């Protein structure tokens, strides 16, 4: 078995950036930033949504996402011009000619 393949599992401080709620949970997350929480120093992970801010857990219909997927899409494609419709020339059908039958002849 290879040695040193697994990351270190340690206690990490998670901070909800929208509400400021803090909680400690075991994780393999690695961070250079640290904070003191309840007398101990922990690596910090900032999350945009947690149980204190998610509408399912809070029961409110508050907008959680500050800059979501729709905003990114609109920002990316707001300067794009709509494509011009392609004009297809139709071939005139000669009158009196029948179209070939698709049935097999015996």
UniProtKB/Swiss-Prot annotation:
The keyword Ribonucleoprotein applies. One of its GO terms (biological process) is translation. Residues 95-106 have a biased composition (Basic residues). GO terms for cellular component: ribonucleoprotein complex; ribosome. SUPFAM superfamilies: L28p-like. Residues 85-106 are annotated as: Disordered. Keywords: Ribonucleoprotein, Ribosomal protein. InterPro entries: Ribosomal_bL28/bL31-like_sf, Ribosomal_bL31, Ribosomal_bL31_B, Ribosomal_bL31_sf. Pfam families: Ribosomal_L31 (PF01197). GO terms for molecular function: structural constituent of ribosome. The keyword Ubl conjugation does not apply. Part of the 50S ribosomal subunit. Belongs to the bacterial ribosomal protein bL31 family. Type B subfamily. This is Large ribosomal subunit protein bL31B. The lineage of its organism: Bacteria, Pseudomonadati, Chlamydiota, Chlamydiia, Chlamydiales.
């Amino acid at each position: 078995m290879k040695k040193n393949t697994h990351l270190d599992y340690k206690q990490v401080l998670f901070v909800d950036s929208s509400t400021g709620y803090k909680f400690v949970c075991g994780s393999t997350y690695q961070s250079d930033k640290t904070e003191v929480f309840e007398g101990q120093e922990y690596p910090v992970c900032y999350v945009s949504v947690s149980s204190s801010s998610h509408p399912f857990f809070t029961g409110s219909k508050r907008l959680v996402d500050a800059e979501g997927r729709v905003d990114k899409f609109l920002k990316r494609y707001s300067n794009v011009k709509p494509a011009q419709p392609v004009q297809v020339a139709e071939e005139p059908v000669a009158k009196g000619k029948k179209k070939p039958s698709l049935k097999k002849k015996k």
